[in-house]
Amino acid sequence: MRASKIIQEAALLSGRGDIADYIEATDRTNFSKETSKACNQMVTLLNMMISELCTSFIPMIATEKIYATDKIEYDKLSKNAVEILKIYDAFGKEVDFKVDYEHVKISSPCAKVVYKFHPKTYALTDNIDYEEKDISGSVLAYGLAAEFALTEGDFDRACSFHDRYVEGVHAISKPKNSTVK
């Protein structure tokens, strides 16, 4: 899922077709500084929103092949790990581990690590680490439109978008076996 597509959708929801056009344009010299600034603000808001979302509601999870015999250094992982969930050996059997400050101690050689991570700061053209199966781009666009409306001082619109965003996040993050009473 590309950051630019989420921002475009949020811009259109917010009545800011100029930002959507700015993102699509190959030559941006004809756009105002205000449009460029608003687009950059949306990129910043998207990063803040994703950071909150991955730490509070829908974690980003990576599965990575890595070979280690006694410990895994955090800097050897491709993403910024915040919690190690599982470690497997070459045969798919879970490996016992202990988390330390600088590394993870493992009880036997491992081949795969599953962990929660905090994403990098995304640029407009980056793909974000969420996939549509994790959360839809439309839900993210509603959240971004809500945040942007707050910065514009449009509290009624912000509440409307926020309600849609929260409804989408709760529908996704609700346990699969939960029942409604």
Could you say what each language-model-derived stretch is?
Residues 1-181:
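Glycine-enriched, solvent-exposed interface loops adjoining structured elements
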